[in-house]
């Protein structure tokens, strides 16, 4: 049966509505979701250590009707650089925030991130912050130990633990009980070092079969994004390498040559490796003064130089020959390009105002430098903040503790300050290299470190049964950046 015309019209109209949508029944599209962006200007700022940057302007740009506030967090810079206002604040539309960065204790170039969050929304922007280290006419090398992991901080007689962990209250590193494999740790340590004037790390090294230091150096330290900010040299630890056997046999010489050939192939070619003169790679040779017989030392050095020449390098050897308890020996000194003394504490105990420690070094610095200069050998003065291994070597040794203060009432770091100002820097100024050596940046086992610690009140108490077996009644304090501040200040005031 044929439908009436009006029915066909109705069906046609409804069909068109189904195809095209009837205006009266469609829902409007949802409004755009409110959002925001972060804008940072300028793209880079700079200052130098001790200074403050020009302002960085941070703005919130609302989108699609966004009317909320944003929690803004600033990240990407190390300890020792301080934003103002603080690293977290509220940002609102129409009220840009000016940020400045002061740099009392860190240097380097960093990508600073400004991260904004509001509920589920998150956006960020960045600027480049460059903090230049202070001018430094000296080479300042500090012994650096890449051997820390969780076990290294725990007491194991002769090998593990720290004095600072046994003090009451404890005075641990500012970075905590860190792992040397952590790149953020290495970045922070480089930033602290170069800001204080340390422009060289002499890196403790023994073969991989002895300890995993080589892996940390090659795969962590030398891969760090900031390794170009500092130079490094190898610190050849003969004592650990050969188990404190100082009889220099032909087999040991062969092993030494092999080790240095490894240096030539894997380290000397690195752009940050310390070279002096006409591209001569520097190596510190630890415990050189203990090697015997002297004739074997002479032969070893001659053979070593020949092997390095064959490898394409005129090596610069700094021998550990300075011992203030022994007169200088020209026969020994003459083997090296320069001499230094890793362990200047030499068994002294107590405060330097009482024990003649600094007076001894004053006399022997003069004697050793004169003897070295007569042989055409440079003298690298060494300085230490103190020494105390009594919480680590509780059974295997009974070494005295050398205080970090000149007296109990003196300021924290006063011995280091006097050693550096009156001896190390003036003697370095009177040398060709103009170099000083610091024992150490981070040897926490022997408490020679100048790496920043947490800040605490002074104490003489420790966790030993007597309450002072480790401190020997000497004053210890969590010192923060005190030693790095002293170093930076004294370098700035020195006359090279």
For the regions a language model picked out, list residue spans one by one.
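Bacterial N-terminal signal peptides that target proteins for export
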Residues: 1-12
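Solvent-exposed, well-ordered amphipathic alpha-helical segments
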Residues: 3, 61, 71-75, 86, ...
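Intrinsic structural disorder/low-complexity segments
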Residues: 8-9, 100-101, 283
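Cysteine-centered motifs
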Residues: 14-17
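C-terminal motif of bacterial Sec signal peptides marking the signal peptidase cleavage site
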Residues: 19-21
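Long beta-sheet-rich domains in secretory-pathway and surface-associated proteins
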Residues: 26-134
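Glycan-processing catalytic domains of CAZymes
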Residues: 133-496
